Amino acid sequence: MVIGASGKTGRRCVSYAASKGLPVVACTRSGAFSARDAGVADASAAALVASERCDVSKASAAELATLLDGAGSCIFAASASPSGGSPWEVDKAGLVAVARACLVAKVPRLVIVSSGSVSKPLSSIYAFLNLFGGIMRAKIEGEDAVRALYFDREGCDYVVVRPGGLTEDEPRGVAAIELNQGDDKSGRIARADVAAICVEAAERAGTPVAADATFECYWADTGKSLGEVGLSNALGGTTDEKAYASGRERRGNTWDELFEGLDADAPGVSQQGWGPSL
């Protein structure tokens, strides 16, 4: 199930899942969804796509639990928009409501699309993006609420995906992607590659792979420290031999290789950093 399927990343999640032969429910505020408009050209793949209405800023707990009943996994790709609620209504309260419903419905895995630098209020990226309705603070508070909710919950886990600067480029695939943990490094990445990461993580529900993990994702050849990445992304910069290395980078030629070795979050522990933007 993909919540926020009408968004740029959400619809790519639906398309990628269907292209893999996975049945997927596309949840939008209106309930309308066109698989063809989302890039699902193959008729047999399009037949795997169903649609449901879900406005996370307005849906009741009972409605969300009913919607999620029987889901094998849930991708939360919803975010604030002029027509769809504020960051506090969607990125925080909406996420928390969906997480609670996932636990009630015993959905094995919740995959959350968040943002790189979200735990670093002193970074220039956080400070800039947070100007838009406090979206970065809403996102990190939503993340941390999920960590608290999932503390010591058997049979259900979460994955937090923190993309770098999102592009509309064609996907480069798993071998081009780098993951990092610690929120001290970022870069650029196509929305289509983020969608692939989310679906691949969701497909591994019920396994230890990436369970309760938070990680950043970006193309390896664009990786920079948070202090450098804003300007680098704006200029289309690439990595050089002097580029910052955290020591926590992950690469792989397959999805299992890419996800291998990711550390789970400290159970229930907040990752919200300190800074003037708070």
Model-based region annotation:
Residues 26, 31-105:
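NAD(P)H-binding glycine-rich loop region in Rossmannoid oxidoreductase-like domains
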Residues 5, 29, 115:
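Cofactor-binding loop segments of dinucleotide-utilizing enzymes, especially the Rossmann-like FAD-
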Residues 1-22:
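N-terminal Rossmann NAD(P)H-binding glycine-rich loop of SDR-like oxidoreductase domains
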Residues 80-186:
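Glycine-/Pro-rich loop/turn segments that contact NAD(P) or position catalytic residues
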Residues 3-5, 164-278:
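Active-site-lining helix/loop region of Rossmann-like oxidoreductase modules
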